[in-house]
């Protein structure tokens, strides 16, 4: 439950991306709510949002939302299979880490590397992508929208194929050496595990 996890982290003073919960219209009779659209639109006015299934995993039913139409489509898709939608502010996160803690000790650490292409200053995203797919370097389900395919990234420019860091959405895991982890990260993870 993304919202409950956010509430616990907030209560413990642990920094995180806060996830608010918006119940499906079919659940309003149980929550005594008066609807969510006014609050959702107010949040959208502040900037880009991420809407996701409050109970979901793997990057499924996760949408970056910039407009009211995108918000309505995201909510419609999420509420088809979930009673609750988690909404958070979009953050341009460059690096995401996962650490597994057991009995108070970190047992596994890895970072998630999003799929990307490297520009040569001449080839379009479409051509670079076709070459990477042919070589088995990129999954074919990561094709960007048509407008993006004609872009020509500069030489050496990294072109990300997905804004999500999920392994099920094409990212790969890079195992990290536990003794080499930054102390700030280790401290934060141990505090979070205790929460």
Language-model features, listed with the residues they occupy:
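Hydrophobic (often cysteine-bearing) scaffold residues that line and stabilize catalytic clefts
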Residues: 181, 185
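Phosphate-binding site of ATP-dependent enzymes
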Residues: 63-168, 172, 180
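Conserved N-proximal alpha/beta basic substrate-recognition cap immediately N-terminal to
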Residues: 1-39, 57
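A conserved acidic, glycine/proline-rich C-terminal tail/linker
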Residues: 186-195
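Amphipathic alpha-helical regulatory segments at dimerization interfaces
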Residues: 43, 77, 191-192
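ATP-grasp fold ATP-binding core
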Residues: 9, 36-62, 82-96
């Amino acid at each position: 439950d993304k919202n409950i996890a956010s509430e616990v982290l907030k209560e413990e003073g642990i920094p995180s991306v806060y996830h608010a919960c918006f119940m499906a219209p079919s659940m309003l009779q149980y929550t005594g709510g008066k609807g969510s659209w006014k609050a959702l639109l107010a949040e959208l006015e502040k900037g880009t949002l991420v809407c996701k299934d409050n109970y979901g995993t793997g990057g499924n039913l996760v949408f970056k939302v910039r407009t009211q139409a995108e918000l309505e489509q995201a909510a419609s898709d999420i509420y088809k299979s979930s009673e609750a939608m988690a909404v958070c502010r979009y953050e341009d996160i460059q690096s995401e880490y996962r650490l597994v803690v057991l009995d108070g000790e970190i047992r596994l650490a890895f970072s998630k590397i999003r799929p990307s292409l490297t520009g040569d200053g001449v080839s379009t995203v479409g051509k670079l992508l076709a070459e990477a797919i042919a070589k088995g370097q990129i999954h074919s389900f990561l094709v960007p929208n048509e407008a993006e395919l004609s872009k020509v990234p500069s030489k050496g420019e990294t072109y990300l194929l997905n804004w999500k860091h999920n392994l099920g959405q094409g990212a790969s895991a890079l195992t990290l050496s536990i003794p080499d982890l930054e102390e700030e990260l280790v401290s934060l993870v141990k505090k979070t595990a205790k929460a």
